[in-house]
Amino acid sequence: MIKNLALQTQFLLLILLLCTSCAQVATTSEALRAPKAPAQYGVDRFTTEQKHNAHYVEVGEGPPAILIPGLFGTYRGFSRMLPLLAPHFSLIALDNFGTGDSDRPDSDFGYTVPEQADMIVNLMDELKIPQCTLIGVSYGGMIALNIAARYPNRVSAVVCIEGAVIMPKPSPYQFMEQGLDTPLLGDAIIGFIRSGLLDTVIAKDVMGYAWPKMDAEDKAEVKDIISHYTDAASRQTWLSLARALRTSKDFTEEAKVIKAPVLYLSGDKSSFREMTETNIDYFKNYLPNVSLVSFEDGIHDLELQKPQETASMILEFVAPERSRALASTTRQDGQALPGISHNDQYEKAYQ
């Protein structure tokens, strides 16, 4: 997630001077049927049997796994993990509705967690996938848990990177909502975002604690990923996405019956730590078999910060027989790397 973007007040004067015409992006009826930029890893695909058009990238061999990005992110947020997971899974890396090359439904879609969840289940139907692993980050983790709660027979396992059953309160995007809800100002903000001038600022915000410790190559790679988040931004869609955490209801009762194994990954240095701790408490009380893993130096977007460690955890949890290919991320005695803490349930699964 992009948490502090709306607080970049030092740029407001420049925003107001921008031409708003550059902020116009095609909506559903005008959506492109080909990606703006081809996938660097995998094959671009589009759904064909749904009312709205969803874009995804397909790569790999093995049991199916769907990767669900965060709120304003695209499938490219998983770019650093795709080469690590592709030898072990048939991966479907999504652009959620409203992001990347997927459609931007308007009047008939609110971008809530359940709506995005239904889109993914429809995609599974179209691809004739009866059951699969769901890997989601942040908003994508919320969607994954929602599917597991509402469609229990469609989910074999869930890997949730700082997602939630209990939404963050107050919404971290309330200031963004206010800005985007004003047409002239909102179009100017989106124009500035799409210009690329804020890509470095946004990358720093996303990476937070980890940014100063990254080398130049990693920073450039993350900035490139972020640039694909922002170049498809539109005012109405990003306004709806910003509202999504407020308009999506907690699904605490439904989640109590989740039967699929769940691995919950979090970072102690995350800017959403309060939200993750609230949800960790919920899991401990109502879903004690959820495997909880915390990275001591981890941020919110572990898929960007720690792709190899995260991929290794996913393999060890979902497909332990395949995990030896990433054994370099663990010590020879089979214990987790230093800086990782986990509950007893996961220790038993990990050894």
What do these predicted regions represent?
Residues A149, V158-F192:
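Flexible "cap/lid" loop of the alpha/beta hydrolase fold
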Residues G141-P152, V158:
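Short glycine-enriched nucleophile-adjacent loop
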